[in-house]
Regions:
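Leucine-rich repeat
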Residues: 1-6, 24-33, 52-60, 79-87, ...
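Amphipathic alpha-helical scaffolding segments comprising HEAT/armadillo-like alpha-solenoid repeats
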Residues: 2-3, 12, 28, 39-40, ...
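Inter-repeat linker/turn residues at the boundaries of leucine-rich repeats
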Residues: 8-11, 35-38, 62-65, 89-92, ...
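Conserved hydrophobic beta-strand positions in leucine-rich repeat
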Residues: 13-18, 40-45, 67-72, 94-99, ...
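Leucine-rich solenoid repeat scaffolds
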Residues: 116-160
Length: 160
């Protein structure tokens, strides 16, 4: 993946769909560090066995600063990865974040309820995570999430 991420063929890309490719944390790190992806607006990495390390690398990527949509659904991202994404200083243009079917629990929900780093985010998908009653209340009471176009969870009274 590291060689592919450095390929000149990646340079003109605005969209990259790499779902179901076993990218893993190392592959996510290679993409995050790739200097060839500076034009990327849409990145789909669902079902790739990406965990917290990969999510942290993507959140800290200066290369992906133009990203508007990030799909990390059906991976292995937990609280640490969710916190890094929610507090990212580099994904300022992100409008859509798909984190459905991961392993995000209460700590991750707390960070996502605040979304201190993703000021332009309008759509957040958190369906099929480890949302308990306390996490549900955090999401429901979040002023930041109430301002968004859509927040998707497994619960019909939160988001839509």
């Amino acid at each position: 993946m590291e060689e592919l991420a450095q390929s000149e063929f990646f340079e003109p890309l605005k969209e990259l769909w790499m779902y179901e490719n076993l990218v893993g944390d190392e592959g996510a790190k290679a993409l995050a560090e790739s200097e060839q992806l500076t034009r990327l607006r849409y990145l789909s990495l669902y079902t790739n066995r990406i965990g917290d390390e990969g999510a942290v690398a993507l959140a800290n990527s200066k290369t992906l600063s133009k990203l508007e949509t990030l799909d990390l659904s059906f991976n292995r991202i937990g609280d640490r990865g969710a916190e890094a994404l929610a507090n990212s200083k580099h994904l300022k243009k992100l409008k859509e974040l798909h984190l459905d079917a991961n392993r995000i629990g209460l700590r991750g929900m707390q960070a996502l309820a605040k979304l201190s780093g993703l000021q332009n985010l309008q759509i957040l998908n958190l369906s099929y995570n480890r949302i308990d009653l306390q996490g549900l209340e955090l999401l429901n009471d979040s002023k930041r999430l109430q301002e968004m176009s859509a927040v998707k969870t497994d619960y019909p009274h939160i988001g839509g």
